[in-house]
């Protein structure tokens, strides 16, 4: 039997997992390596917009046309990852009438359904819009869960025979005889079925073809291979509010600018964004003024944002690219199109292609085109099926809205579980009995946590990505330790505590940019719960000295404290004090 050609995909974001799925469905032998969790890079740090294309209808019509086409595809194949909120491009009195008309005309030229609404009609859809807005354009924007989408693509790839290796960092590209023949990876700390090496272990993975799908990090992979990939990373801030101040994507209808979009996402709203070029996608300043800008500017569209509660902020890095010699200075002017860089044609280095640019909405189209390219290189004749075959969990998830009573769940919890799990809800929610809620903010049940642990091992941040547990208002104050409890008794205490610490630190990275008002009070409560009540600042398990538990008081006999509130014991102590102290009391 003839061996299938092998392809190595570098990068576990939406594009990388989409490529792995596409190639695996065509029958190729696929391995994907990712240095962290899936969605470690740009995919896990975006505002969750499913583009209609309206944002690019004036400035970048090729990208706009790609967006509306893929918007329709994703609604069909990934319904459990998408919420069709609709979108509004809102004009304020100071915004240009000419630009408004250009936006409307551009949408229609690109095949994007667009309807003009009066201010009153727009406020019927979103009552909290500013009272002085002029009008709006309605478009089919939506919200997409990038974590769920990425995991679903990876799961489909595995179902079709692909191998996924997380926590495996590429540290070199293997070049022999003037051709790329594979990569060297160094395995990092991690657990679960997708971790295939010991921490620090170095492994060579050889392949017939290598795809560099690392986005903003593509230049670093290019350096390993001795070629120049001119990615221009551009950072943007996103600020998360505690509730959904709007249920529709709200855009400012004006030319390019910072702080011009509000995306309702799950139980929150995400405000975005800035666009500032950086040299290193791993190391750049996260500045408070950027967060302030989001709130101050977008309050002009939705005034209640000025006094709303901010729960965290985070930054992501766009993998922008333009052909050499273009010379664009402002990153907002760089196209959002994607590019395939065939290093055989471009750099006389066969065996590797890089894919750069683009956006999450068009990930599947990007994956299809590079998969066509790889198949042509390898002489494989196989059609793409990813636009027609639903992702795991997406086949018939609407019927799951009736599961609440069956599983003894409060209906909001059942509804949220069905939305997250899609057609897998029956299987997962029946797997644990009893099935209490672990994360109240996001309505995540124990069954969902256990299901996520099947692939996450001890990585609680991976559980967070899959379920949204710890991503609500309290940012894990109430549920983080509950999540860690689910690791016992399979894992020892040291391992569980280390996993819990990693989850806390990941939560803290974004919380520290939102410490004012009500959220500061929430953070103080979280600190008191964990640092004081749970003694996490002075962890006795980490102390060198052994604890003499025999020296502790035995306490009240069972039921005593409930029966008399401890009054009898207090009276005994008072009598002892009056007598100068009894044995053992000093």
Curated annotation (Swiss-Prot):
Pathway(s) per entry: Polyol metabolism; glycerol degradation via glycerol kinase pathway; glycerone phosphate from sn-glycerol 3-phosphate (anaerobic route): step 1/1
Q: Which GO terms describe its biological process?
A: glycerol catabolic process; glycerol-3-phosphate metabolic process
Organism classification, top ranks?
Archaea, Methanobacteriati, Methanobacteriota, Stenosarchaea group, Halobacteria
An annotated GO cellular component of this protein is: glycerol-3-phosphate dehydrogenase (FAD) complex
Q: Do the record's keywords include Aminoacyl-tRNA synthetase? A: no
Enzyme class label: oxidoreductase
In Pfam terms, one family for this protein is: Fer2_BFD
Name of the featured protein: Anaerobic glycerol-3-phosphate dehydrogenase subunit A1
- Which reaction equation describes what this protein catalyses? a quinone + sn-glycerol 3-phosphate = dihydroxyacetone phosphate + a quinol
Q: Which organism is it from?
A: Haloferax volcanii (strain ATCC 29605 / DSM 3757 / JCM 8879 / NBRC 14742 / NCIMB 2012 / VKM B-1768 / DS2) (Halobacterium volcanii)
Null allele outcome, as annotated, is: Unable to grow on glycerol. Can be complemented in trans by glpA2 under the control from a strong promoter.
Which UniProt keywords are present, listed alphabetically? Cell membrane, FAD, Flavoprotein, Membrane, Oxidoreductase
Keyword Plastid listed? The answer is no
Task: State any single GO MF term.
Answer: FMN binding
Which cofactors are required for activity? FAD; FMN
